[in-house]
Amino acid sequence: MSYKVIVPATVLPPWLRVGENWIFARHRRTEVGVVLPANTKFRVRADFSRAGFTRPVIVRLLNNNRNTEREINLNNDQWMEVEHAHESVPFVDWPVGERNIMAEVYFEIDGPHIPLPVYVFNTRPVEHFKSEYRQSSSGYCFLYLDLVCMLVPPASKNALLDVNIFELHQFYNEIINYYDDLCGLVEDPYADTVDSNLPNKAAFVKADAGGPGGAYYGPFWTAPASSNLGDYLRISPTNWMVIHELGHAYDFVFTVNTILIEIWNNSLCDRIQYKWMNKTKRQQLARVYENRRPQKEATIQALIDNNSPFDNWGFFERLIIFTWLYNPQRGLDTLRNINHSYRVHATRNSSIPYPQIWSWLTTSAYDNFWLYFNLVGVYPADFYVNEHNKVVHFNLHLRALALGQSVRYPIKYIITDFDLVSKNYDIKQYLESNFDLVIPEELRQTDLLADVRVVCVIDDPSQIVGEPFSVYDGNERVFESTVATDGNMYLVGVGPGVYTLRAPRGKNKRYKLHLAHSPREPVHPANDHMYLLVTYPYYNQTLTYTPYVNSDLAVDMAHLFGSNDRRYVATIYFNPFEQTVTVHLNNIRAGRENNTTLYFEMVISNPFNGQSQTFTILEDNPTLRQGYYKFDVVTYSSIRLNMSVAGRLLFGDTFLPEGTTTLTMFPNQVLEPNLFPDGSALNRTLARLREQAAFLDNYSQLMYIENELRDSIYLASQLVDPASDEFVKYYPDYFRDPHTYVYLFRFRGLGDFVLLDLQIVPLLNLATVRIANNHNGPHSYFDTLYFKVELRDTNGAIVFSYSRRGNEPMTPEHHKFEVYSGYTVELFMREPGNRLQLIVNKMLDTALPSTQNIFARITDTQLVVGDTSIEDNLVTSINVDCGDDDNQKIRVVETLKMIAF
């Protein structure tokens, strides 16, 4: 008997490659519609004449055991004769990665064979199908349940006949749809965007008595390792096997050498149990708690207290860290964002290594989880390789500061007597664990307040006394004051939580800041990033100021990558100023799992006493803990770096070769053999300066917040070229203010009411417009244009424009936008004179032309003002003839009186 099977292609979105197994990409196939008894002979061929496909067409003879199945590759349109010794159900795989093709496959079957009962969801009554299957001599049947296709084996026939197929359909489709949503996948029939899902996808489920373990997710199907489907027909929120194996379809690259194999997919499983279960069931039935939450929390507490390396934690201990990571309001957006980032990366350049997983999660979150990660013993790497294959700085803490991220931390470490059952402070939001992560805003309802003293330890109190400080929860300022005359900060009426402290950093001296609880009460997670933990009961804090003289940007470093996928392993800092070498270890696996072969070794030798220090990284390092390893050195110490492979240790801009490279610590730099101190260190410092300046340009909010990077830029610029003003705009306020001009144009109307303020700060590339509320308009006596503000870019395009007739109502508005050198400002005022004022650094400029039209051009640091249009070649002139009949002069408005902007 003849059969013809036509199968479409599986179209891949741009982020998915042929041969990858994610989201069931190779699971689609079409049944021939028969069951072949053992030893059945048949012929098969594919029609290549019209299809246009470039890969073999695959026919599979499936049953319930991989050891008795067969795969047939059709490479041309010639007939192939086949005889198979085992009962089987023939299928044709959908060609993967092709577009706009249909594969046609022809079968000629000799001898008897059995029709395969097939059910397509919602196309006929279920009972009609079950009746057909019940009466059929076939032990097999095939189900199309939208997002899952299921080959039911003979051993599961009775179980399938007893199953509610509508509920089975709902069970599988809800799981896959939810996992798609968690990953941010969007249905798209054209599959041509970075977030496109796989069109017409479906998981393929079968039995496999020869399969590994209890069940598995494979490239071509998911199956229990049994001759029957077992739990794959059990509809229950506790069916961990099914939700676990389906979750593997979404592992992507997140489990590659991250110690998260069987963790990442289970974090999705936990989320769907979270969705399905009510509060009581969540505690009793969820796999992460199993009615033993207090005991599991105690285990986590012991691991933290003992500083156990996170990579050595147990399976479910690591999993529950993700439970608490994803529980907060926007926690799941972290998961969606990191998946989107992966797809962008895969679409753009799959050869570039992915970021270290903890850095990746940190930069994908809407809240700041860095302190939480440190608590459990993982350290996000602060470097990554960008799309141009260049190692760049994440600046994780500054990025969080610029984005106004709130810091989440376990509630039990904030309200130290909190207990979910016995003392929960009647908190109204849903919490399921004493380790749930909260922010200060969520704890206001407790009405717990503290007066906290921050003791400042500094060599020169005059650098900070009387200076303002503030405390922030994300973007919200919750407290502000000034440093008291005794050199301390006093916080009054502050609720519990982790805040960001914006502390003064000195005036003409710069400092590094370190924040911690009092030494006798080491509760606070000490840090250099101004994360201020206010506990209940509260403790006082200690803020230690250490003079900052030599910029960190002048410190050379090396970047260590993994052997196979170039994953980020460690940063090595060679600090000649502090005479230290510091290793920041971010990944304990540099190569193959469980392999103890030497991967990297550093030996530091003291030339004066012959002593040496050694730091070793094997391919796998289960006993190492992520974090910092610091070694003291002396001038002329030799630092021997031994690499087992080439091209995985980047020093400066050069990948070091396999074998040994010896560096020497000089007073101001580290050099390779046969080299002598030269200007190369300054060149590398200048390159880092420009890179970090670009970072501040990208996160311009940091230009208005005192921070260590601005200190570092100032100190490094003084080292590279003290006379240069290239980096002035990035300096700390104390050093930047003398170069900062703030121009305020103020428009007034009838009764001298303020209509509009236009403020321009050229050095910071910032313009701000504040428009007042005036229902009657600027001046009700005029029905014509009364005033106008317009800014244009260097191409003449309008950046901002606002105008009103005299009797045209005004409503309040506030605009903030960037302006650059060469931008022009055009102002019109119907009644010039006192109705249009220019205030420079809080001083009224009395020489503003008293004309209706005022023109100005922005330069790098100042504003050129006149009453006629300013040509490009006049931009830098201080006194220039405009060429008009009145010989009007254009001046640079300047003053010696500065303000802290």
From Swiss-Prot:
Glycans are attached at residues 265, 278, 339, 349, 540, 594-595, 642, 683, 698. It comes from the Viruses. The keyword Glycoprotein applies. It holds the Pfam family Mucin_bdg. Residues 27-330 form the Peptidase M60 domain. Keywords: Glycoprotein, Late protein. Gene3D superfamilies: Peptidase M60, enhancin-like domain 2. Involved in disruption of the peritrophic membrane and fusion of nucleocapsids with midgut cells. This is Viral-enhancing factor. It comes from Pseudalatia unipuncta granulosis virus. The gene is VEF.
